[in-house]
Amino acid sequence: MRVKRGLASHRRHKKYLDAAKGFRGGRSKLYRTAREAVERSWMYAFRDRKVKKREFRKLWILRINAGARMHGLSYSKFMHGLTLAGISLNRKVLADLAVREKEDFAKLAQLAASKLN
């Protein structure tokens, strides 16, 4: 008896077409173009999960730098002062303090400045 493969290929095609839902034109309707678009989107997604970490770190450093400069310190001097003071807060928390809790950040900046001198 011959092997009929319609079910297997239909499932495989459906997997890609479901993943291409929301794409425009033939990219969501035609199997071959949908597969190419989906596989490319998976590559971009993989790459950008790494890029996202870099982007957030850059944003946090930018915010900490802005907060530190409001208190007369550069980013590097502020971070070095915190290290000398034995304060080990990560950049995400420091950036959040700089934006939302300005008084607490000012205290940290004052402490960092005192440890530098």
Curated annotation (Swiss-Prot):
SUPFAM superfamilies reported in the protein's UniProt record: Ribosomal protein L20
UniProt-recorded Gene Ontology molecular function terms: rRNA binding; structural constituent of ribosome
Keywords linked to the UniProt accession: Ribonucleoprotein, Ribosomal protein, RNA-binding, rRNA-binding
One Gene Ontology biological process: translation
GO CC field: ribonucleoprotein complex; ribosome
Domain of life: Bacteria
Matching PROSITE patterns: RIBOSOMAL_L20
Tagged with keyword Transmembrane helix: no
Job of this protein: Binds directly to 23S ribosomal RNA and is necessary for the in vitro assembly process of the 50S ribosomal subunit. It is not involved in the protein synthesizing functions of that subunit.
Cited PANTHER family: 39S RIBOSOMAL PROTEIN L20 (PTHR10986)
Similarity section: Belongs to the bacterial ribosomal protein bL20 family.
Name of the protein this chain belongs to: Large ribosomal subunit protein bL20
